[in-house]
């Protein structure tokens, strides 16, 4: 059964071969990377590149937070998007406002996107000490905000901020925040590892437990489950894949892993892993050979140097410096490469160095058109 954002609602916890919806948040969460500044035109260029590639959902920004994002959504209304649905992002209503008078919620409606993503508090620490409301009021803020948007015909994604930390602190309350969102009309529930510190095995346990507990609610309606992981413990991609294995079918990530602090889950690696190493269908799989181009194009627009050592798409991702490795690669490219680099638009290379052997030097000479006859290296 397909969910409202293109993913599957899920039945048993261990399903395979279901489509996984990729939701790109480069233009919003990725833009929070220190040193990364995107102009309005930069954002539009990246959005067009993502749409051309086949990204199903693109989060364009937070229209309630800054004028540039308001301008982005105004410009986006005039563009015909071939494949992507645009999403506008914002928070639940302010504690002092009713939904209908809340500027943030009304800015989301004014963006006129098919998808609206609202985040709310799952962690009692944030409820008690950050937004400083009662726990009952926080549940009301979630339900009323989502209801206000959903009743106006938008597809509603709920981002449960700090869900994993909240679950560890008070699992019952964290689950109640999800129920408030679901029952108010959210079609997708996204579990966010906002501080990026959850270990992979624990993430799997919590995702499975949350899904099972909400599915057991009497009269519960189906929702799509999502994941939003950060890389503070260098586990963002692994955690997202573990969440998919635990039943998640909506994955939020950024191109090249751009994001605040240590970054977000890397959409490039996630797409390659899911398309090449899992049984799940992912949008963009038919354009996988353009993945390196997409990665480098976004880096260029962002005025950031590509990471040569980035998995799959980096210049050195399939480079072989050691002589033993180089000799083996000449005989069979599978010897020291987990995939054919061409599948993601990359290429293998043998590197000339003091660690290299004849194969490395010979390969480089051939690339340069240098004749090695009688050199002892042929």
Regions found by a protein language model. Give the residues of each.
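Alpha/beta enzyme core
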Residues: 20-22, 28-58, 65, 73-81, ...
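Short, glycine/charge-rich beta-strand/loop segments that flank catalytic centers
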Residues: 90-94, 121, 312-317
């Amino acid at each position: 059964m397909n969910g409202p954002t293109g993913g599957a609602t899920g039945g048993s916890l261990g399903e395979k071969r279901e489509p996984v919806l990729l939701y790109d948040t480069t233009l919003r969460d990725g833009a929070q990377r220190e040193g990364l500044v995107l102009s309005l035109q930069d954002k539009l260029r990246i959005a067009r590149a993502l749409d051309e590639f086949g990204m199903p959902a693109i989060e364009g920004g937070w229209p309630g937070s800054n004028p540039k994002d308001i301008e982005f959504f105004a410009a986006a209304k005039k563009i015909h998007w071939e494949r992507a649905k645009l999403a506008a992002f914002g928070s639940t209503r302010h504690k002092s406002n009713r939904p209908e008078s809340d500027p943030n919620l009304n800015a989301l409606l004014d963006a006129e996107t098919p998808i609206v993503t609202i985040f709310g508090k799952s962690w009692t620490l944030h409820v008690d000490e950050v937004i400083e409301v009662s726990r009952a009021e926080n549940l009301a803020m979630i339900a009323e905000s989502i209801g206000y948007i959903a009743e106006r015909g938008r597809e509603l994604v709920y981002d449960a901020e700090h869900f994993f930390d909240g679950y560890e602190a008070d699992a019952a309350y964290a689950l109640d925040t999800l129920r408030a969102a679901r029952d108010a009309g959210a079609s997708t529930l996204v579990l966010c590892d906002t501080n990026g510190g959850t270990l992979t095995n624990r993430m799997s346990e919590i995702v499975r437990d949350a899904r099972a507990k909400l599915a057991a609610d009497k009269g519960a309606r189906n929702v799509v489950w999502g994941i939003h992981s950060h890389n503070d413990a260098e586990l963002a991609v692994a955690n997202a894949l573990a969440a998919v294995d635990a039943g998640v079918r909506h994955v939020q990530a950024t191109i090249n892993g751009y994001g605040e602090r240590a970054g977000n889950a890397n959409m490039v690696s996630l797409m390659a892993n899911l398309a090449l190493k899992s049984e799940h269908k992912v949008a963009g799989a038919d354009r996988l050979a353009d993945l390196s181009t997409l990665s480098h194009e976004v880096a260029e627009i962002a005025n950031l140097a590509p990471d040569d050592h980035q998995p799959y798409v980096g210049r050195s991702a399939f480079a072989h410096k050691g002589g033993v490795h180089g000799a083996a690669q000449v005989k069979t490219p599978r010897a020291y490469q987990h995939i054919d680099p061409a599948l993601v638009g990359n290429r293998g290379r043998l590197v000339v160095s003091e660690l290299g052997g004849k194969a490395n030097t010979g390969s480089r000479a051939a690339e340069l058109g240098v004749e090695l006859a009688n050199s002892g290296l042929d």
